[in-house]
Amino acid sequence: MYSFEYQRATDPKAAAAAIAADSNAKFLAGGQSLLPTMRLRLAQPSQLIDVTRIPALKSIAVDAGKVTIGAAVCHADVADHAEVRRALPALADLAGHIGDRQVRALGTIGGSLANNDPAACYPSAAMALDATIVTDRRRISSKDFFVGMYETALAPDELIVAVEFPVPERAAYVKFENPASHFALVGVFVAKFASGVRVAVTGAASSVFRVPELESALSANFTPEAARAVTVSDSDLNTDMHASAEYRAHLIPVLTARAVTKANG
């Protein structure tokens, strides 16, 4: 790891100003992705701007039809928050199965979304729930936020402040995970709204994506049988040491069916 400077920001404007003044600086939240990259000398930021003590980034609010989570809230706090568990249990359940205890105690929702790892869990929730990512300067719909592998719509000096999740009628998340890392080989988040069903998949491609065929089938008939009857193409899916594209394509309707069963209680 190369040497770097560290400073703790006290508000979003100060954090953004520090990054704007140094193009080689990086925001630091839980550090669960950034610090390992730095240890391998794959990243060499000149400064780390710690945003974990900014009060505006640490709050959780549950209002009528919406759950708002500050960007610096760790996974464990999302999982354990009583109001989140009541209003949006699928999100709490997702957070409670990210990584191990250390990762859940340090990793943050904002850091996960900004990093946009292809196998991360939170992007599937953001996409399926039609979340809005609130930054220090604008509001970004989830459909516009995730651009590609480790890429988002964020500007280099733009800071996520909070994430707003609409509350669906029913929802569930199911993943087939790597037993060592707990990353998803395939993860499926299903959300049923009055307007229809949204299905988002992580771990299977270069970035999170929705599956229109499953959404149409489940909007017409919200049953596991309807999900299992859908065939998903493997043409744009990943093949790696963990699973082939064909196997991932097979898993998507299987896990979707399990998520529907889970959502139906």
State each model region's role.
Residues 1-265:
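C-terminal structural segment of proteins
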